[in-house]
């Protein structure tokens, strides 16, 4: 039985799907005007794990995540680069697939694009106008926020609270400062579409409502995204969707925590804006994913190299223990009864499922993986060789790998072979003889980065993999 924290009710609830055996998920995707940053990568990874766990439990998951390919940021980028909005969007959508693919994020069931749903968006807005939930004003269309009685229920704010910070910008012809834009009047030189309200383009919030409705129907099981989207984006989605559909928009709302960089908020002005496209050239994508899931999805993450290196070491311990089990398989027999180990392994998988059932607690799931790794090391050190036990170890390692999305083996092309290490040790010895200590230290540090430890022995320098 899976429970999850529902932002709408601010409590954990037992998950009950609309349709037995099926989960309909909508996850807000990126605005494709640039490469995604690690703040975008977090929900991609977190909700990929949620999807994987539902699938592990036997559910069919319809996973929809959109691309915002019409937006102020894209229009500004278009002017800056002197390229068309569609061309820029196409380029960064391709880059998105490459980046999240490197992070082992499964491809969504569907990735709808705003431009492909323009007719549906216009019809949706027209129906809101016809029902009195929206109004036209000098080429723009606004949603009548006060007409929707439940406004503020997701962010747990009253209309009076919201009114305090609301204002009408220059050029806006709103009835109320709380009203938000559904359709923007075209400006000279900007991409636009014909509509009954005049030429223009959709507002940000309406895009997700329409794509979710088109892909998943009136009511979806889970709507997810970053905490920064809770208000106003998700609040506005609820208002316009429920006004249009006359039904609850989503039964469960999930929001992941923020990412800080060295204890500071990530921002371009601070110069700590990290793009996935860049960081995966320096940090193994498997390590980055493992780092992300080592923290509960609702908790904030502090990104720094020390913590990433700790995640790297942790993942290497797991992989090394799995390699030992694989090597033991070649000499496995069924001579001795070792059912006690089967019981211990089964207790760990039960522990894993218990914590994942509790709001997808990947931090504790990783702890269960470490426990499995320790047990595997103990098993090998005792020179045990039961085929049954080794098979069960491998099976559970694979379950953890599949659910958490972290491969059991790294990219072999990135690993130094033994003969390469021996050559580097010889080169280091030669450098020390020649008093080239800078080169000797450089080789030592390079090997250390590969988690290879050098040891001085009476027989000479030896190495071991950490």
Swiss-Prot record:
SMART domains linked: DALR_2
- InterPro entries, per database record: Cys-tRNA-ligase, Cys-tRNA-synt_Ia_DALR, Cys-tRNA/MSH_ligase, CysS_C, Rossmann-like_a/b/a_fold, tRNA-synt_1_cat_dom, tRNAsynth_Ia_anticodon-bd
Q: What is its EC number?
A: 6.1.1.16
Cytoplasm: present as a keyword of the record?
yes
- Annotated keywords: Aminoacyl-tRNA synthetase, ATP-binding, Cytoplasm, Ligase, Metal-binding, Nucleotide-binding, Protein biosynthesis, Zinc
Intracellular or extracellular location(s): Cytoplasm
Residue positions binding Zn(2+): 28, 208, 233, 237
The cross-references to PANTHER family, in alphabetical order and at most eight, read: CYSTEINE--TRNA LIGASE, CYTOPLASMIC (PTHR10890:SF3), CYSTEINYL-TRNA SYNTHETASE (PTHR10890)
Show the GO cellular component annotation of the record.
cytosol
The protein's enzyme class = ligase
A GO MF label = zinc ion binding
Q: Which family does it belong to?
A: Belongs to the class-I aminoacyl-tRNA synthetase family.
> From which organism does this entry originate?
Staphylococcus haemolyticus (strain JCSC1435)
Cofactor: how bound: Binds 1 zinc ion per subunit.
Domain of life per record: Bacteria
Catalytic reactions of this protein: tRNA(Cys) + L-cysteine + ATP = L-cysteinyl-tRNA(Cys) + AMP + diphosphate
CDD domains listed in its UniProt record: CysRS_core
Name of the protein described by the UniProt record: Cysteine--tRNA ligase
């Amino acid at each position: 039985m899976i429970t999850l924290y529902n932002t709408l009710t601010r409590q954990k609830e037992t998950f009950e799907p609309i349709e037995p055996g099926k989960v309909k998920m909508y996850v807000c995707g990126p605005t494709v005007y640039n490469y995604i940053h690690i703040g975008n990568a977090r929900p991609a990874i977190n909700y990929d794990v949620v999807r994987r766990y539902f699938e592990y439990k036997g559910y069919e998951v319809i996973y929809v995540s959109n691309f915002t390919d019409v937006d102020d940021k894209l229009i500004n980028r278009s002017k800056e680069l002197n390229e068309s909005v569609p061309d820029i969007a196409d380029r960064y959508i391709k880059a998105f697939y490459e980046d999240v693919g490197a992070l082992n994020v499964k491809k969504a069931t569907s990735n709808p694009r705003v431009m492909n749903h323009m007719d549906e968006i216009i019809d949706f807005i027209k129906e809101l106008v016809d029902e009195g939930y929206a109004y036209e004003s000098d080429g723009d269309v606004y949603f009548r926020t006060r007409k929707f009685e439940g406004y503020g229920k997701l962010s747990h704010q009253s209309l009076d609270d919201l009114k305090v910070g609301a204002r009408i910008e220059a050029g806006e012809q709103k009835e109320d400062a709380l009203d938000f834009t559904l359709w923007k009047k075209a400006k000279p030189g900007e991409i636009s579409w014909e509509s009954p309200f005049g030429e223009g383009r959709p507002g940000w919030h309406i895009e997700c409502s329409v794509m979710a409705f088109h892909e998943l129907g009136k009511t979806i099981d889970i709507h997810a995204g970053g905490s920064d989207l809770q208000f106003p984006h998700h609040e506005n989605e609820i208002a316009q969707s429920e006004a249009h559909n006359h039904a609850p928009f989503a039964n469960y709302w999930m929001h992941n925590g923020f990412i800080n960089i060295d204890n500071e908020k990530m921002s371009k002005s601070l110069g700590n804006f990290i793009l996935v496209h860049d960081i995966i050239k320096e940090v193994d994508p498997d390590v980055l994913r493992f780092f992300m899931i080592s923290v509960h999805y609702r908790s904030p993450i502090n990104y720094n190299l020390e913590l990433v290196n700790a995640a790297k070491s942790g993942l290497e311990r797991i992989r090394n223990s799995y390699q030992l089990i694989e090597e033991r398989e070649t000499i496995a027999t069924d001579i001795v009864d070792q059912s006690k180990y089967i019981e211990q392994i089964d207790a760990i998988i039960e522990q894993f499922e218990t914590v994942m059932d509790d709001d997808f607690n990947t931090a504790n799931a990783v702890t269960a993986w470490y426990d499995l790794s320790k047990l595997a090391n103990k098993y090998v050190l005792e020179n045990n060789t039961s085929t049954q036990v080794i098979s069960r170890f491998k099976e559970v390692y694979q379950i953890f790998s599949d659910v958490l999305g972290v491969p059991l083996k790294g990219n072999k092309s990135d690993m130094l072979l033994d003969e390469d290490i021996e050559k580097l040790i010889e080169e280091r010895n030669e450098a020390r003889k020649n008093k080239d200590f800078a080169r000797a230290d450089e080789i030592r540090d390079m090997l250390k980065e590969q988690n290879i430890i050098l040891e001085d022995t009476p027989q000479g320098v030896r190495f071991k993999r950490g």
